[in-house]
Amino acid sequence: MSLQTLTKRIRDKNGSREDQIDLANKLFRGEVDVYFPNKEEFIINFLLDRLKENSNLTCVNIGYWQLFLNIWKSDKLSGSFRVSAIRRQSLYPIILNAFEYLIKEFKKDVFLKISDVFVCVYSNLNILYISRSFPDQISLLFSRYCYLIASKIDDLLDSHPNEVFKETLICVIQSAVHSQASSTKAQTQFLHQTLGSILALLCKTQKGDPYFSFLNAVLMKCVLTQHTLDVLLLTKKDSSMTLCSLLNAISFEPINLKAIPLFFIICADSINFHLSSVEKSISQQKASELMYKLFSEHIAFLLSLKNLPEEATLDCMLSICQVFENDNLHRGHSDEYTFAMLEQLLELSVKTLRQNTCWSTSWEMLSSLLAIDFDVLLPHSKILWECIKSVSHQDDIHALKFLKRWVRASAKARILDSFCIDWHLNVQTMSERSILTNRDFITSFSAVAEVSLSQISIKKLVTWLMSSESIMSENSNRFVVYYSLCKSLKRESYPAHLVPNFELFTRSIFNASLKNFNILDERSQALLCMCQISHVQFFSSDMSISASVGMKTLFEDLMAEKSRGLSSTVWSLQLLLCYLEQCLRLNTLHEDTTFPMRVVNYALEYSSKALDKFAENSHLILLDMVDVGKPDLVLTLLCRWLHMVHLYSSRTSITSWIYSIASKFYFIDSLNLETKDSVLESNWERFISSTETYELDSIRDSLIDCLIRLLCYSSNNAIDPVSAPGNLDFDNSAELCSSLTRFTPKNIDFVLKSLIHIPIHSITKNQRTRLLNLLIIHEKLLSDKDNSAHISLRKIIYTLMKTPCSSGFYRDPKIIIDLMQFGKTDLSFHKVHVLIMRSWIQHLDEGNKSEVILKLLQLILADFRELPLETITLIFNALVDSLPTSKHIKNSNDILSSVFTINDMLIDEMTAYLSKKESLCSGTFSCLLACCNSVLRTQNLTSESLNKLHILKVGIEEKAISLKLNELPFLENWILFQCLLSFGGDDFLKVVAYMVYYRRTVGEMSFRVSDFELALSRLSTNDADYAILNILNLLTSNECDEFDYSVLMKVVGVFANYSDCFQRNRHLVHMVLLCCTHVFYNQTLKPATLIDSALDVFLCFVQKTSKFISLDSFNTILTALSTILNLKELECEPKDHANLILKIIQILNGLLFNHRSYMSGRFHVFYSILKSLLYSMVQHDSEMKKIKGIALMNFYKPKKVPIHVVQSFCRLLTTWMNPNLMHDSNKKNSSLTDAERLFVKATTKHFVFLLTDFMSAQTVYQIDIQVKELLTNCFYNVYENLSNHEKQMALVAMNAPSKSLYQKFVNDYLIFAKWNEA
C-alpha cells in the first residue's frame, strides 16, 4: 500500500470510522509496511479532526481516545508540535461534546479515558497557558463533569479522581479565571454557573469521601478566594451576587438539601484556609465576620424555602448550626442580622415542639443555639420550661442534652440561682420520674454549681428552699434541687455558715420524718436519705451525737420493714455507713460497737441477697436520681466502706460475703451471662488491685480463703466448702480430686486473674500450700486441649512457689513428678516447668534435702518405664544442675550413683531411638541430650559412661541428615554435647564447624560459655595454638559470610578470656586484632551484627596487662574504634547502639588503666574518638544530624542516650584528668607523680578543644537536663587542669553564643566546683 493510498483511506470523510481507527492503530504500531515519517503527528491531527465531529461514532469511541493517549504519552512527538496542535484545536470543546453524549448514554470506560487524556495533555504547563480557554467554557466543562459523576456515582465509587487530575483541573480553572480583567467577577460567575452541579454531586456524597475532598480542594483554591468571599457575603442584600441569591436561583428538591451543609463546610474550610495560610490574607476579625455572614446567608436561604418538607429543612438547619458551633473561627457576639436568624430558628424549634413534630431535631437545635449564643434563648426561659414540661420520657437524651447545656449557659450568664428557683418550682408540677430528676442531669448540674455558685448564692438558695412552703409538702420531688445543691458542696471548701441550715434540716425535716418514715413512699424515703448523706460529711461532734438517735431509729425501721424497696433500703444503708464513718473520724462512737456491727453485717447480708437476682443498671443516662442497681451496695462496700467492713464484721461473714460476689464470676456458665464490660467486674478488679485490701488483715485473709473455697467447691458436697480452707492438706488430695466438679477454663481463669493481683507476701505459708494443692488438682481435671489454661495455672503455681510453702509440699516427691507430667510434647511448657523445678529444689529443707533428692531419684528409677521421658529429663536436668551447689549434702555418693544410673538408662533410650526407622521427636531428643550435658558438666563420669556417650555421638552424626533435627533447642544441645565431649584440637574445631553450619540454618544461637571454657581447659598448648590459628585463617578468608564471622568472633572471645595461648605469643594477639579489624573494611558484610563481638574481643585484651598487647596492637585497636565511629551504614536498634557506645567507653577505660605508656603522641586520635562520643550524648534533632566540621557518630540514630552511658563517659573523662584516682581511692587532691603530671598536661592541649565542642553543642542541640548536668560536672575536671593560656585559647575559638555559655560555665565553676571539693 502506497503512502498516498494509506493517508487517503485514513482521512476519507466518507469512510468507515471503525476501519479508519483500526488502520491508524496498525500504522502507529508499525504493522503497515510503508515508510511514513512523522506518522505520529499525522495520526494526532487525524484524531483531533475526528474527535470534534458531532457523532457518537467518534467522540465517544474509546478507540480514538485510547490511541490519542498512547501516542501522546510516547516520546515520538516533539514539544513544539504538541503546543501547536492544541493551539490549533483545543480539547475543551471536544470533551464538552463527548460529555453531552455521555449524559444521554453513559460509558464508564470512555469517561475515565477522557479524564486520562485531559490530565496527560493539560498537565504540561506550556500547553496549559497557550490554550484558548474561557471561563464560561471551563465552568461548563466542570459543571458537566460534576453532573456526570453525580448521576453515575454508584458506577464511579472505585474510580475517584486522583491527585494529578485534581491538580491539573485546579490549574486549568485558575488559568481561565485569571485570564479575565476581573478575576473576582470571573470566579463569582464560575460559581454561579456550576453551583447546581456542585450541589448535585454533594448530595450524593458525605464529608470525608474522595469526591467531597475533590470539590473542597477545587473550590477552595480556585473560586472561594478572599475577594470572592467578600463579594458573596459582604455585598448589599439586593445584589444578585450574594450567596443567598445564587442559592435561590437553583430549584431544590428535598434530597438536594443534604448538599447545603456540605457546601457550608467547604465555605468554612476556605475561610479557615485563608486565615491559617502563610500569607495570612485575612485577619481573625475578618474571618469571624465572614463566618457569621456565611451562617446567616445559609439560614436565611433555608428559611425562605416554603414548599419543602419542614423536617428536611430543619435537619439541614441543624447540621449547619452544629458545624457553626464547633468551628473556631467566629468570635464575640452575633451581629444584628445573625441574631435575628437565631431568633427565627428558636421560634421554629418551639413551634415544632408544641406540634410534637421533629422532636429530637428540635431539641438538638435548641442545644446548638445555646452553644452558639445563649443570649438568644435565656430571655425566653418561660417558654423553654413549658417545653421541658412537655417531655414525657425521662430518658429523652436530646432534651437531656439541652438541659445540661442550659445549666452551663446559665452559669456563664451568672443566673444559675434563678435557674435553680425555676427548676424547683417546675419540678413540683411534674411527675415523680421526669427529666428534671434524671441522675445524669443532677450530676451535671452539681459539677457546674460547684465552680459557678458563690458561697453567698448557695446560702441564699438553701435559705429560700428551706423557707419554701413546698419543702414541707408531700411531693417527693421537693428535695430534688436541695439535694443537687448539697451534692455540689465539697468538705474542703464548704461555707461554714451553711451548718445551721443543715442542722435545721436534720432536726425539722429528717428527724421529724423518721416518726412516720414507713408511711412515706419509697422515693421520698430515698431522697431524704440522699439529702442527709450530703449533710453527714459536714457533721461536727455535737451534730453526730444529736443525730445518733435518729440513725438508730432509721435502722430499727429498716430491720422491722422487710418489704421496703431496693432504692430506699440501699440509700438508708449508705446513710448509716456514712454516719458511722464520720463518727469514727470524730471519735464519738466511744465503746459502743454493737450498733456499727449490726449495720455492717446487715449491709453485707442485704448486698449478697440483692446479687442473687443479678441485673446490672442500664446506662446512667436512663436512670432516675434515686434509682440503684442490685450490685450498687456491693460496689460501695468494696470500694468505699472496706475499712468499716474490716472493723465491724467477723472474718467468717466477710469470707461468705466475698464468696457470694466472686461466685457470680466463677460460676459464669450457670448464669449464662457475659460480664466482660460489667460495672461489677470492673469494681472487683479495683478491689483486688487496691493496696487497702491487703493492708486490712481480715479482708486479705477472707479474699484468699474465698478463692480457696471456690476451688474446693464440690457438686456432691463431699467436701464442705466452709471448712475446706482450714482442713485442706495434701493427704486428702486423691479424695478431693474425685469429688471436684470439672470447671471450664473460664472459671479457672477468674481465680488465676484474681491471684495475679495478690502480693505473694500477703499469702501465708499454709494458704500457699492449700492453693498449690488445689491448683495442681484442678489442672488434672482440665482437658488436655486447654493449653492456655494449663500454662496460666503453671505460671501461678511457679509464682506461689517462689516463696517457701509448708513442709508437706516438699516431703513427697510424687507431687513434683505429677506436676511435671502434663504437656510432655509441648515446648511452651518447658520454660515454666524448669522454673517450677528450680524453685522446688531451692526451697528443700537443708535437713532432709539429701533424703528427698535421693527419694526422687529412686522414684524415677522405679517408674522409669511408666513415666514420660519428657518428665524424667526435666526433673533430672534440674536435679543435676543443682548438684554442684549441693556437694556438702549427705548421701552425695548415693545420689551421684543414682544420677549415673539414670544417665546410662537415658543413653540406652537414645541409642534405641537411633535404631528406629520412624522420625524422632526433636523436643524429646533435645531433652535427652540436655540430660547428658548436665551429667558431663559434673566431670565425674566413668570411662564406661564416656565410651557410651562417644558411641552415641557417632550414631547421631551418622544419622544427622535422616534425623532432620534442625530445630534450635536440639541444635544448641547437640553442639554443647560435642563441646563437652571434645578432648583435642580437631574435636574443638569440629564443634566450631557445626556452630558455623547451623548458624546459617537457624539464625542466632546461644551457648554456655562455661562449657566452652571446660573444653578449652582440656586442650594442650599445641592444640590450643592449632585451633586458634585455624579459626584466624577462616576469619581472613573470603569464604565466610556475616553469620560465620559472628560465630567465629564469639569463639575468639572465649579464647581471649579463658585460654593462656595469647600470654605465650603476643604476635598471636596482634593477628586476632587484625582479623577483627578486617571485618570493618569488608564491604560485602553488614558490620552491624559483628561489631559487638569484635568489641568484646578488644575489651578482653585491653583489660589485660601490657604483656599481652604490643604497640602495634594498641594502634590497631585505636584504628578499629575510629573506623566504627565513622561507619556510614549500621542498622541497629537504639538499645544496641547504646550498648556499643558503652563498650567503646569501657575499652578506652582499659587502655587508660593498663596501657597508658602507649598513649603518648596519640592524644589527637583519642580527642577525635571522645568528640564523637560526646556528640552521641546529646539528643539530636531529626533535621540536624550532621554539622559542618564536626565528625558525628554516623550510625547513631537521633535518640536519647541512656543515662548510665553518659555516667560512664563522665567517669572516663574524670579519671583521665585525675590519674591518681586509678590507684589512690577517694584521694583526688593527693599529689601527682611527675609522669602523671606530664600525662595530664599533654592531654589538656587537645582536650581544651573538647571543652569548646561541649559549649558549641549546647548552642546547636537541645540537651537533656540531666545529661547536661552530668557533662558540666565532668568538664569541670578538664577546665581545672587547663593552663591560663589554654583557657584564653578556648575563649578565642568560640563564637558569641558559645562564649556566653563558657563565661557562665567558668562562673559556676568558681562558685560551686571549688566549694564542693572543699
Swiss-Prot record:
GO terms for cellular component: cytosol; nucleolus. It is found in: Cytoplasm, Cytosol; Nucleus, Nucleolus. GO terms for biological process: ribosome biogenesis; rRNA processing. Keywords: Cytoplasm, Nucleus, Ribosome biogenesis, rRNA processing. The keyword Nucleus applies. It holds the Pfam family Urb2. It comes from the Eukaryota. Its main location: cytoplasm. InterPro entries: Ribosome_Biogenesis_Reg (IPR052609), Urb2/Npa2_C (IPR018849). Required for 27S pre-rRNA processing. Has an early role during 60S ribosomal subunit assembly. This is Probable nucleolar pre-ribosomal-associated protein 2. It comes from Schizosaccharomyces pombe (strain 972 / ATCC 24843). The gene is urb2.
